[in-house]
Amino acid sequence: MAEDNSWKTPSFRQSVVNKINEAIQQSGMTSSKNGLEMENHVFQKARNKDEYLGYVARLILHVREMNTKNKNQQNPAGGSQDGGNPNQQGGMPDPINALQTLATQGTRPQMMGGQMGPGGPMGNQMGGGNASNLLNTLNRPQMPMTGGMANMQGRVGTMGGPNQMGGMMPGQMPQGMPGMPNQMGGAMGPGGMSGGKIVGQMNPMGQMNPMQMGVSGMPQGAGQQQPQQPQGQQGGPGGPNQMNPMGGMGMQVNPGGHMNQNAINQQMNQVGMSSGGNQMGNLGGNSPMNPGNMGIAPNQVIRQQMPPGMNPNQQQLGMAGGQMNQMNQGVGGPGGNLGPVQQQQQPGQVGMAGMGPGGPGNLQQQNNPQQQSQGGPNAAPGQMNQVGGPGGNMQAMGNQGNFVPIGANPMVRKQDMMSGGQVYPGGVVRSVTPNQFLRQSPSPSVPSPAGPGSIGPQSHPGQMIPSPALIPSPSPQVSSNIPAPRNIGQSPGQSLNTPGQAAAPSPLNPQEEHLYKEKYRSLQKYIEPLKRMIAKMEHDDVDKMGKMKRLLDILCNPTCRIPLETLYKCEAALTSQLGTIREPPLNNPLVEAVSANLQSPLGNHTLQRTFRPCLEALFGPDIKNLPTPAKQPRLAIDEPSTSGSTGSQEIPHILQGEIARLDQKFKVSLDPCAIGDTKTIKLICWLDDKHLPCVPPVAVTIPEEYPFTSPSCSLIEQEYNATPFLIQVQKSFLARICKLPEMFSLSHLLDTWEMSVRQACSPNPSLVAPSATSVLLGM
């Protein structure tokens, strides 16, 4: 299959830059690099789309983690323990350096953190895969940080109410809504349905997939089953002890630790809620609530303390009534003894301890999902520790509840809260801090629908999942036909002021966003004057020029988001330097471009080439230059010298102009025999053409109303009847005169006379019959 290069497009990269900038603004982190530089660094470092999306996800999580770390440092009593991550030292390291450190952790197992939902732990989801699913969520509007963020699986917020859990960080739990004591994460309201999913993953290749979250990458024997079963509890109208797959894959676990394939198919897509029942195989036993030991109000998250003998995998919540089932499954191999290992795990986190090489058929499974202790210290008797496996040599982890009564504070940070520990072949427990578990994995850890040997729900951190919006996406590489459910939900956005975020005003506030865009648009008019000023003061004040260049960078780079107050300061500085500039007219750029191009020598040539055809099509060809007048006047006006004449005969200017524009072969003069008292003008015209024979002249009478009345012409009959040639000229001329229109000019008349002479000179003069068109065109 061809490699997907859509992540290299400028639009995709710009959307990633915007998300990085939003994360930086929300965390309030000050860094020497902006989002554009960080994204460019990641882009140059990544070799393919999965690496690129994985780096970006961890970069954004690192930025958010910095905010949480600062809060924890300011509150030591509720702070988390530092497990020695070099990136967790004092101060605020640069995200790029943290990203470079992450790249060296190529073989470190990946842990998965679940989050506490309102009124109880959320349904954890566990699955392996690559980061190809990040594309679906990164391109989705209103979900800038959803889908496939590494190591942040299983976060679900409630729909509606003030209890939305948009961007909760580990160690922080919001106060649940009253009346929802028994509901797990993803609850839709009192009696709603949870989004917990039961996921089984088969790895028939005999080796654990290093992309799986929370699984240490230790090779196993051939034929091992490694089912990962994050168990999401759900309290609904029927009873508090129900395990509801909610459209996921319900998997029954029997005491032998084997998977029941039939149960998988039967419980798939179930939304059943059997009253008081348990849909998780042999997981039974209720933890009765001791009302006398209830020391806190309903839905208050208490501070969890860990004595040496207590399993740190417990989450203790004081609920308002009902019964909650505690579950702890500790499963070892045939010869393995996990025993009382204190696996330190983030509350709400599903930990899969990757134990050493075991025998074939070893079912390695350790699911400690969201233990809930109802009531006080006596709430532990109802715990059920399921032990299974071929060898049967297993000891369940001890679950001890310890309640600390709290009065007014409904939300207290957990203390001594450690994220998922990893059991290595030597039995050593490796613990990491809650801040480190976000950056455990150097590779993306979002399950792909077609991931090798893995079926897992793809959880979008930060999403509110309306139950049970699950769309099965079958995995072609898995032998069993178990669809991998995929969560489709709306993101509450990055703008929720949850406890894990700074309570700063959101940059996505529509009103502030509108003000920012309007102000930024109004400052665009200063760009050109600022450029001219920088060009003028190039060798003057270096410090001032540096400030001007920074201002220009802010105005020219819309992706560089700055606070609104800074934008007002920029406007004040520009106004003081450049004065108030009126908004330029819309056509100003066009005028400037035309004037700049006209400066070049090719400007006129370009205009001629561009516009001449259009002008000719509209207005016709240009008027040609008039023929040069003859050196000698063609019309010699003889002043009559008769004694009776009172003055010379006036010739109209229009006639003079026409005679002056006649061809030089026509010679025109006044008729000396004409009577001078009348307004009618009589002319004698000769044809003087070296290519035509000499013919007698014609007499033309120009009426007084010329040119509104056509002139008349008469041939001297005595002369034109002399020879057959002249007779032919006379016949042709008379025939052509009849074809002329009602109104014609002196020029038309003389041209017709010339064509009659030419027709008479032709070898077959009688074959040519003139028409009105030919005569009018002078043919």
From Swiss-Prot:
Subcellular location: Nucleus
Compositionally biased tracts (Gly residues): 114-130, 274-284, 351-361
Keywords assigned by UniProt, alphabetized: Activator, Nucleus, Transcription, Transcription regulation
Compositional bias of kind Polar residues: 70-90, 98-108, 477-500, 640-649
GO molecular function: transcription coregulator activity
Low complexity bias spans: 209-232, 240-270, 285-295, 304-329, 339-350, 362-383, 393-402, 451-468
One GO process term, biological-process aspect: regulation of DNA-templated transcription
GO cellular component: nucleus
InterPro entries to which the protein is assigned, alphabetical: KIX_dom_sf, Med15_C, Med15_central, Med15_N
Region (Disordered): 70-131, 209-407, 437-512, 629-649
Signal peptide: none
Superkingdom per UniProt: Eukaryota
Entry annotated with the keyword Nucleus: yes
Keyword Transcription regulation assigned: yes
Pfam family, one: Med15_M
Record text on subunit structure and interactions: Component of the Mediator complex.
Protein family: Belongs to the Mediator complex subunit 15 family.
Task performed by this protein: Component of the Mediator complex, a coactivator involved in the regulated transcription of nearly all RNA polymerase II-dependent genes. Mediator functions as a bridge to convey information from gene-specific regulatory proteins to the basal RNA polymerase II transcription machinery. Mediator is recruited to promoters by direct interactions with regulatory proteins and serves as a scaffold for the assembly of a functional preinitiation complex with RNA polymerase II and the general transcription factors.
UniProt protein name: Mediator of RNA polymerase II transcription subunit 15
Organism: Aedes aegypti (Yellowfever mosquito)
